Amino acid sequence: MFDGFLRAAAATPDIRVADCKFNGASAAALVSEAYEQGVSLLVLPELCLTGYTCSDLFLQESLLDGAQKALITLAESTRDRNMIVLAGLPLTVNSVLYNVAAVLHDGEILGFVPKSYLPTYSEFYEGRHYHSGADIETEILFNGRKYPFGTKLLFRCRQMPAFTLGIEICEDLWVAQPPSIGHALAGATVIANLSASDETTGKDIYRKSLVSGQSARLVCGYIYADAGEGESSTDLVFGAHNLICENGSFLAESERFCNQMITADLDLSKLVSERRRMTTWQPKFNDDYRIIEFDLEMHPLELRRYIDPHPFVPDDRTDRARRCEEILTIQAMGLKKRLAHTHCQHAVVGISGGLDSTLALLVTVRAFDMLDMDRKQIMAVTMPCFGTTDRTYHNACELVHRLGATLEEVDIKAAVTLHFSDIGQDPSKHDVTYENGQARERTQVLMDIANRLGGMVIGTGDMSELALGWATYNGDHMSMYGVNASVPKTLVRHLVRYCADTADSETLKETLLDILDTPVSPELIPPEDGQISQKTEDLVGPYELHDFFMYHILRFGRHPAKVYRLALQAFAGVYDAATILRWLKTFYRRFFAQQFKRSCLPDGPKVGSVAVSPRGDLRMPSDACVTLWMQELDEIVE
């Protein structure tokens, strides 16, 4: 356990029906295996110390005594193992039999949680043997000592309070109001379900939907351990369908009909962050719940979890295509509404031959098609200046032609040169004034053309540029509607690729592919030998890194050190530690310093879970200090 991560396991032991000694030894073997794998929470199935299918044998004292002895032995196997283990058994309390989960830690029993809902329908007959433990909160005597017993028990790690465990048993999940709802609202971040769910055709799909839905609804980790081979096959077969889910996403799933252990690293700090962000998450400080604390040693964990280096871009090609179509539609629908509301008949787009302006033009074309407006009323303006290359100029012109928009060329060299003369700027000095003077001239041209036509200037800047402040204030920073404002650079590339793949013209596809192949550049510095000399990623860092940083910082509010650690894993073999740390510091420094630009952004549609609009997802002071975050980064030892 480290950095808010918890390695959890769900395991199905090999059992023999009613052979408690064998079953206890089998469970203990899984404890040893889990310990070797660095597991901090091991969940075993319902009634695994006896077998779920003992039926009327549950009324035999020999079986019940054997289960207790097996539990005592199993508890001892957890000593000095730095883990929590959950195991199921039948337990008699005040002459009444309960189906319970025992919570074991460091050789001790922490408590017992009974099953609330007992199915007595179809193939199930639990009401014949057991009583419901719903709403029971007491202490019981077991093996000469008193232990907590009840459904409202939570188990919390002192060293990492984000690890707070709630427990339910099998059918408890299948009812209208599962106990896990109360557990989560009382503070549980992890729900363990000890289950014995038999297999019938199609049941696995429904089971997965229950686990996924509950995990998402409760913003929690959900570990589901299922009974498997070894249970009686008199009437039923059990598939050992083990599942580990986090906030609706499956981290691990066992192969059915094969007893095995699955493990996954739950990100508990992410769950806490998500709950904190959602103001509709309203915990109930319920005095009925009893918190039982335990100790676990904190140690670095070599993550087995896949960390997506491109969190804004789906890996699956089909899903990516669907997502691209959806995003393009959202962008176009936003612009469509603005055009219709303003009765605007013209759109003005500055087109450079780069990715962002290409996407903005493609979106504008979609919006005009939705409105049944003539594409010729889209004024695509190319404004060559000192840094423009033949390649980008040609691609800009070709793109406009293939899309059927109107092309207007305004060479701004003379205007910018005159402006430099007016303000005393040396044109041979390629500083920020030299660059920003061109950007602001372009914006002025676009705004004035829009006024001439009674049109609207469509913004081209993307979210990655806005996060870094890589935009000229009141230059390309400004427009009348910014269609790309919540689209990160890594996603821009895939959106343009999708448009190329679905283009109805081979020449349009070729143009888009060449634009994709062109280095990202503002082209504000003169080229060298006709080639782009100013490459954005050489100056501010790789956009794939910055998009990764942005996602984890804005979406989950992670500590800088954790962002760094995740990036090391996500980009292993791509960037070394020094490179990642260098650009992470750059991101934080620029992100804080450039907020003043984001504080006055034009309107634009939100397309994903992260956005930087000052009216929506990011309401941040423009003069906040970055010191706290930089100090944490300075403490990192590479």
What are these regions (language model features)?
Residues 1-350, 366-375, 407:
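Enzyme catalytic cores with a strong preference for nitrogen-chemistry domains
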Residues 6, 23, 161-163, 220, ...:
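ATP/NTP-dependent adenylation/nucleotidyl-transfer catalytic domains that generate, transfer
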